């Protein structure tokens, strides 16, 4: 850690460099050159970061778009140090994404940010190549913002533009979401709905054929009442991590007809599948 211990830490990799954020106070972003691991001759070895980037404080997550060479720390809760244009009590850019240029991996610098939606818990950033021709080639941010989802064009780092906002029924904590590989659908997990409303693990699917006009498509309910956490798509599969029900693989090949089904799972907490944190 760059400062103190914390339960929350996130790491993403770009060009053989690990970018590390944490909710530890004043942590900023550590940059570590992973190629240093190739020359280890005797273990154990305690490494220090190559860069301790302190232009923002704590953050819950970090997102990287490898195509553009930008990192996006989200969930910042401390005021910034050097990039003060949007400082406020809620953190740099009010806890929204910070636009960090990492095209030279060990020389990060902030180019801007987006504060229009307040705190962002997690996000996906893509160079868009989907069905909406208005945004082909644009850099699109989709943020899970606790009680809604925001879609933002962040191509121009000094002038991000909100495209649309998504609300849905029985919202409790909009935690994380991910595009299908064709960018047509966005699959969302609400972390606390099982605790708040009961029922089995709920996954929400939105049709994003038109980014300006997202449409709720359908809900999928898993076989257990466990709390869901993060989910990612690979091809025709959606891999969903759950607190007490392990990793579930869901076949999404028939998502167009609103038919998705679990095909296998790996249980990491065999004691029970209750809607509790572990």
Segments the model singles out, each with a brief description of its role:
Residues 1-278:
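Feature marking well-ordered beta-strand scaffolds used for ligand recognition
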